[in-house]
Amino acid sequence: KDKVIFVIQKQEEHLFPDKNTLVVEDNIGIAKTREIIYKTAGKKRYLVVDDDVLLHRRNATYFSEPSNMEGSKRKLTDNDWNELLQRLNYQHDNNHIICGFKFSAILPRFNQPTFYNGGVFAIFSIDGEQLSKVIDEIDFNYVPIQEDVHFNLELLTRGYPNAIMEEFCYHQKYNNDGGCNTFRTQQMEDMCAEKLNKKFPKYYTIDYSKT
């Protein structure tokens, strides 16, 4: 409990009477909410986690180690959490500003428990000390959605590498009711894609033949 802060809107305060909370204004959107989280956390190291995410650990056999569980993956244990935090700190100590996780439905890279410079979504660890050097240069509200793609590209194009856990992975159901789906539209998706393409034309392209 002491290590978890729920980021909630004012209209939700009554639902979290005994929790540590960071309260933001109602209906400000995911991009502005993320900006507030980053700037409030400052130079700490911290995890940002969507509220519908589950974490799993994959069987060590994927990485040429003896099996450490039944099946291909399982939910994290307390010992897994301790090991995961050690690995995240190791990556941050080695200048990886942000660390993410592989989506559980995608097979891992064999014999590679960590890979580098990919997309980071849904759950990630941030080194606030490194982020503090560029945080004021980033327009976190450039797009109202796809803000995670924008954040990834802002950091990568500035030369800040990331690390992505293969052995530890996340599960998330997409298009659940609530959240961004209360205001996301196809028109908004298209507008954000065009803005990202304009800002990062070398790395974000649009295939108009499929539209």
Spell out what each predicted region is.
Residues L55-V149:
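Conserved catalytic core of nucleotide-sugar-dependent glycosyltransferases
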Residues D2, K19, K43-R45, N95, ...:
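Short coil/turn segments at beta-strand junctions that form active-site/ligand-binding loops
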